[in-house]
Amino acid sequence: MNMKKFVCLILAIVCLFSLASCSLINKPDTPDEPDVPTLEAHKCESICDKCQKCLDAECSESVCAEKCQGHEPVSATYSFKVMSFNLDQAYGSDSTKRNRILDKILSEIPDLLGVQEETTAWADYLEETLKSEGYVRVGEFRSTSTSHAYYSYREASAIYYNVDRFELVDSGTFWLSPTPDVEGSVAGGWHSAALFPRVCTWVVLKDKLSGLEFAYFNSHFSYEHETLRNESAKLIISRIEELGIPAFFSGDLNFASNEETDTYAAITAVMDDSRTASPETMNGNTFHNYGYAAGESYGDGKCKTVPIDYIFATKGDFDAISFKILSETGDKGDVSDYYSDHFAIVANYQLTVVYER
């Protein structure tokens, strides 16, 4: 080997050592088990599943997009289960009823639960028992008054949400009246038939899986007069539109969609009814007054042929998958045969997120 080749070889070796040293110096410390947030990791794996890259500690949407160029955008689908349940305010202290209703709720394991006629007895029981199952309660009672013997003024339309899945961003309760932010206000300004304060409870939640920020409203409309229900619907829809984010709305609304078309139209102008939007659905009454069939008269009333309990979702935001009525059978008028005078309802939705690059 002549001297010139020898010098070139030495220089090449020196350069290689220099490059290796720079690489070691500039290489960031990588922990053995990188602490990647669950949501970020989920997005990253969804985006980069096809090319099997972007699995390091620096994983992020932008990095994924750069490393996975040439691959089609990847979508992820997330499920939401919403349950609405009128508890019947008269039985909050009945241990048999309470246990049956708790079993019914836990058999579905909803992500979101809206209840109506939740008295203090019901709230004390459900808040404590559902807390151990991972649910948090939000809701105010419609009044602090206890002056009415039967229709307790201390009644709420509370919301329970899965705390492992959702992060609370904001919440509140307003009254179904011309003065919605006045606590305990009655809707006499809408119609003189109004007897009691009525409330709507709402939450804004952030889904820890999809990252979606959305709202959920839950209420119990007046049975006294159509005008009260119509004005209540318009008020709630206006609050949903003010937020400007995807939303669910559930409740015992005390009207049939085939009878009070104006009230139903006020809601469905903005939201889809899960019963009619779902490919898998059920029909029939949800208020049965302990065993009366759809269309059958009882006392001074008559059961509707369609639900008066509803779950809605804002148009174009969620795909309704299924709607079901959790019906029971028993002897007509036998309170002990049924968990409530209403059947609970459940709607399943899907949200599809496309991660663009």
Where are these regions (language model features)?
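N-terminal, active-site-proximal structural segment of metallo-dependent hydrolase catalytic domains
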Residues: 23-26, 31-34, 65-132, 142-155, ...
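Secreted, short cysteine-rich peptides and small extracellular cysteine-rich domains stabilized by multiple disulfide
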Residues: 43-71
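Positively charged n-region of N-terminal signal peptides that target proteins for export
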Residues: 1-6, 10-11, 23
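Metal-dependent phosphoester-hydrolase catalytic domains
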Residues: 227, 240-247, 255-357
